[in-house]
Structures are given as structure tokens and as C-alpha cells.
A protein has these predicted regions:
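Charged, amphipathic alpha-helical oligomerization/scaffolding segments
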Residues: 8, 12, 31, 35-38, ...
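A structural signal for well-ordered alpha-helices, especially hydrophobic packing surfaces
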Residues: 17, 21, 40-44, 62, ...
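Residue-level marker of intrinsically disordered, low-complexity segments enriched
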Residues: 4, 17-19, 30, 34, ...
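Short terminal alpha-helical segments
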Residues: 1-27
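Amphipathic alpha-helical binding modules
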Residues: 8, 54-82
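Acidic, low-complexity, intrinsically disordered interaction modules
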Residues: 25-66
């Protein structure tokens, strides 16, 4: 996993998380969940594995999405020493 892949993931997830947690529009939140799940499917497998920590439906489960994206952003911040 490269620093560039970590920075890219952080930029995308941080921005989408901010909009997601402040949005009250269900269609917008659904669109963000879809975009993040699609991004996760193309993410570096090593990076995704580190973030998911064995959770198979990480960033793909509607019921745990806010928790998952918050965890991912937190871990990425630690990896980048932010």
C-alpha cells in the first residue's frame, strides 16, 4: 500500500463522510453509500483489508455505514499522522 493510495482514500472518504453526516436527504445519503461501496471495491486490497479488519461487509452495509466510514477516516488519519 502506498502513501498515495492512503491519501487518495482519505481525501475521498473524509469529504463524503462530512456530507453524509450532515445530510438529512435520504437520496443523498444513499448516493454516498453507493459511491463509497463502489470505491471500496476498487481500493487497494491491502488498504481495504487493513481498514476492514476482517469485516466482510465493511463500507457496504447500510445499517453500519456511518460507523464504518467514521472508522475508516480515523484509521486513515492515524496512517497519515493527521
Amino acid at each position: 500500500m502506498t502513501r498515495d493510495s492512503i491519501e487518495t482514500a482519505y481525501s475521498f472518504l473524509h469529504q463524503k463522510r462530512y456530507v453524509y453526516i450532515h445530510s438529512r436527504l435520504e437520496w443523498q445519503r444513499d448516493d454516498i453509500e453507493y459511491a463509497i461501496a463502489a470505491y471500496a471495491d476498487t481500493m487497494s486490497p491491502e488498504l481495504f483489508g487493513h481498514l476492514a479488519d476482517g469485516k466482510k461487509d465493511f463500507l457496504h452495509d447500510h445499517n453500519h455505514f456511518e460507523e464504518d466510514i467514521s472508522k475508516a477516516v480515523c484509521l486513515l488519519e492515524k496512517m497519515l499522522n493527521i
